[in-house]
């Protein structure tokens, strides 16, 4: 029975793959400036500079769009934790170190642009936003595959494979979330901004996906262990956001990111790209874990069906409430006239 490769061995063996994918990334990426996506002429001073404080009526975004934008921004705000995580697992030497810093620099634009847009358009309470940012960054983040707990848990990815496989799914999930949030905003500038951000996330996903693919070819059993751990315990990095569960329900009900999207647009495309259920190089315990993963996919499908039913019932309840309110308003209006 062959021994698992150490992280140092994996880093060394995968270094040419990383360098190749960095070069490809640099030819595909597009330079852009956050300020080009902000409607500055819509802005005005807040109270401290002689203007007025934020008023909820100023926001032109729907509740779903507002909650999704807030959640996306707070997720981006935790970049210091993400940088720490990948630096710890990828190292800061050679091509790996170059990628860590390059990725961080590109990711940093996202939070800058989203915050500027929300503050200039007065789409969200700036005081609440800053309070949430402080709390979110103070909490930090460690990958969800280690079942991060609320409170003082201080858990990290256990291996290079844990980290690179997790961020593959996370980057794709973030891309999908940003893209669907742009559509939910129903506002041209916001949609263009989030298209630009999601394009960055897609290129980042491709980098991690292809490095992971090389890892599967190099040490399939070892990679399979990490894949099983990642997917069966997956949590988005926004998990640490205050009141995340309530926000997640709003986002899911609004069609921005729900169980069906997670399975069909995130999980399955990556598994198909890696040919997880077609490969014949998993042996022993890894083969068993692949079978368990297939069962997990079936469970995710069941969750999707249950969610779709619950969502439809919720929409029907909302429609009935709106119908009753409209009828009541009509009756009041008729009486007044």
Where are these regions (language model features)?
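Non-heme di-metal
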Residues: 1-337
